[in-house]
Amino acid sequence: MWLRRRGLGVPSASASEGGTSSPAWTEMGSWVRTICGRLKQRLRLDVGREICRQYPLFCFLLLCLSVASLLLNRYLHVLMIFWSFVAGVVTFYCSLGPDSLLPNIFFTIKYKPKQLGLQELFPQGHSCAVCGKVKCKRHRPSLLLENYQPWLDLKVSSKVDASLSEVLELVLENFVYPWYRDVTDDESFVDELRITLRFFASVLVRRIHKVDIPSIITKKLLKAAMKHIEVIVKARQKVKNTEYLQQAALEEYGPELHVALRSRRDELQYLRKLTELLFPYILPPKATDCRSLTLLIREILSGSVLLPSLDFLADPDTVNHLLIIFIDDSPPEKATEPASPLVPFLQKFAEPRNKKPSVLKLELKQIREQQDLLFRFMNFLKQEGAVHVLQFCLTVEEFNDRILRPELSNDEMLSLHEELQKIYKTYCLDESIDKIRFDPFIVEEIQRIAEGPYIDVVKLQTMRCLFEAYEHVLSLLENVFTPMFCHSDEYFRQLLRGAESPTRNSKFNRSTQKRGESFGISRIGSKIKGVFKSTTMEGAVLPNYGVAEGEDDFIEEGIVVMEDDSPVEAVSTPNTPRNLAAWKISIPYVDFFEDPSSERKEKKERIPVFCIDVERNDRRAVGHEPEHWSVYRRYLEFYVLESKLTEFHGTFPDAQLPSKRIIGPKNYEFLKSKREEFQEYLQKLVQHPELSNSQLLADFLSPNGGETQFLDKILPDVNLGKIIKSVPGKLMKEKGQHLEPFIMSFINSCESPKPKPSRPELTILSPTSENNKKLFNDLFKNNANRAENTERKQNQNYFMEVMTVDGVYDYLMYVGRVVFQVPDWLHHLLMGTRILFKNTLEMYTDYYLQCKLEQLFQEHRLVSLITLLRDAIFCENTEPRSLQDKQKGAKQTFEEMMNYIPDLIVKCIGEETKYESIRLLFDGLQQPVLNKQLTYVLLDIVIQELFPELNKVQKEATSMTSWM
């Protein structure tokens, strides 16, 4: 048979070589292969082979147990014990798996993470300022008290408040006052800046209270740190010398390096963009519309606060100091003084320093006294959906006037009771659209009277519920809506229009206004138009900048200033001796004056002026009676007089005008407040011996003495050559002094101003140091020093990628495997105990971090941290730590890190491995640019947690970009 098949096979082979194979033989081969493949799939031989490869010991024991069961079948009842154990192990392994974790076994440790509810700030809050409802749909979001005044119900200890106030005061003293005091001494702008800083700090404190700090640390910040450690480990594998570790790590990051680390200028630009991105959430509503304010705050925060703070945190010396504090097992220092009382957050810091009345700050009483303002205020309340708040005040006032009568009839009590029921249904019921939020006891008292018999309404005469409700609503109007109205479009329309008020008669029958006719804003347009009109002076074209109050398209020819001792008198006959010291000067009142220089007859401007009463008594010796007259001078004419007297006679220390008001209205009220100061100035001038025969001063005090001579003009872009040639012939010096200084100052004033950039941008980071001193230093140099056109990826950053490790237990295993290189048996043991102890360890870690944070936020420690931050930002002139001190601190840090590892772990991994691993971590923390990289990554995570709205904005921007 074998030979036969062998013989049959020969011709088959020869036939195959000839290309004529048997179809039956081919079909049989394919059928056998199919059957074997199906049998292999059913038996899962590949899976069995892989299991044997992964678990050789377990498979060997299972094989031995199977062989023993076959050979020793008489003792099968004994072998069932081992089979039960194997079945239990397999069952638990298949049912639980690595993702199945045992709950926390430490029942005494309980940590409750914070529940993230509604955001108190932007875009919705937990309580409406008017009705108190959650997610109020009737009133605008800007009416939320937490949005407009986030410091409400926010209290801190007085010592912490004082420390924060000190830091903010230093911010103003170092970055605002050095240049602001050169402009004006008015504190109005600084007061607004104080409120803005208080708003910013309050928003941060509220948002920090809302986030779960331990969860952020364990779930996000530590994960970013693990990725940073991985980069350092990979970089260390490429280089052996520590000096090249930082550069190797930066190359390992590649395009995933944080954008702020590309260069120091990119870092500053990133901080600027970050602050601008946060402005809608950290500044008061509508504050971002003010370009100058946002630009100033951006430069202060980015260049003078955040940049030095991040440099301080990334400094290896600072990192070593923080590590020593964290590793130190000594008990924390206890407070030596009792806790200070709680005070409203930064209330003392935000108190206004400006004592002068501001046109942008009105009282509710002022609004109610003027019908035009009250009308504007009601329109504003209608726009805000809160006109019923004012209506409640008016209704309660009328109700109180009626109920406080001594004797009330039954009809009057019945009418009052019906009115009270309307008040209750309109303003107290939850279903009412005009509901106002009151304390519960107020609503209960009003409800009890409203639902009781009508004769009980007289009890309201002695009850405090209605009075407290009125005080609450009045406070709401004064503290919330009135400031909002002063910054609203309605009020600005009122200022631009100029309110006509009742007039009064003066001694010269000139009408005035009660509050001042105009605030000067309505004339800005005409002054800008005047720039493009010109007049000639000695062949030079001069733009006509009308600065005087009330000018409208005013054009005048060049004025020749004459100051000499010639006996020219505007009031009396010539050649009469003049002694200004004998003149009596007073400014009894401020009046209004129609500008005769206006070209448009139909548009006469009424300008507030000082009325100067002059009594001349220096000609009695020649038989003349005392002469009386009045002169009307504008506010700016006084400063022109002072400037010209200074040019001819020098300064007079005992006769000085107050600081000139450049920005802001110079209206009737303002001039009235300056009346006594200007009167004293003139009285002191006429008493100076060298001015006793001054023609300039006499012209100023004479009704016809140079009406346009004292109108201040700004004259840029003039022909200096022609002016210099004409000055000696037109100027006659008084007593021959001060001509040369006058000519020099005149030439300087005529020089053309330098062109201004179209969009000015601050470049000086701090007025106390040069720009490059903070931007470039020896520690950070130029960061990674990468070009702007370096390849960048579209994803957010290197650290937001999904990682397989999650939680403190996984982080410890990761560090042990990557850094400490633990043996396989220990790694498998840790993986086995992960199911039992992962949740327990993470719960204990959260509890431990929460306890540490509570200790850190104790009063004395918080004050100490704020002091350290203050010293890091503002103590620029203090000597830095010496290199020897820094090396000593680094050595101490390394020793503490070596001692921190338990001896049991050292026995498992070995002493040499311990040293190499700790050295790797320590060397990674001594690289300033790498520390800065980690700092910015952690900063981004913290910002996204504090301001989750940024994630929505970014998603919308990303979707919009992808759609386009």
Swiss-Prot record:
PX domain residues: 588-708
SUPFAM superfamilies: PX domain (SSF64268), Regulator of G-protein signaling, RGS (SSF48097)
Cellular component annotations (GO), alphabetically ordered: cytosol; dendrite; late endosome; late endosome membrane; lysosomal membrane; lysosome; postsynapse; synapse
Residues covered by the RGS domain: 363-495
Transmembrane segments: 51-71, 76-96
InterPro entries: Phox_assoc (IPR003114), PX_dom (IPR001683), PX_dom_sf (IPR036871), RGS (IPR016137), RGS_sf (IPR036305), RGS_subdomain_2 (IPR044926), SNX14_PX (IPR037436), SNX14_RGS (IPR037892)
Transmembrane in keyword set: yes
Single annotated GO MF: phosphatidylinositol-3,5-bisphosphate binding
Keywords associated with the record: Cell projection, Endosome, Lysosome, Membrane, Phosphoprotein, Protein transport, Transmembrane, Transmembrane helix, Transport
Biased composition (Polar residues): 13-23
Other facts noted in the record for this chain: The SNX14 locus is maternally imprinted.
Function text: Plays a role in maintaining normal neuronal excitability and synaptic transmission. May be involved in several stages of intracellular trafficking. Required for autophagosome clearance, possibly by mediating the fusion of lysosomes with autophagosomes. Binds phosphatidylinositol 3,5-bisphosphate (PtdIns(3,5)P2), a key component of late endosomes/lysosomes. Does not bind phosphatidylinositol 3-phosphate (PtdIns(3P)).
Family, as annotated: Belongs to the sorting nexin family.
Protein's UniProt name: Sorting nexin-14
Organism: Mus musculus
GN (gene name): Snx14
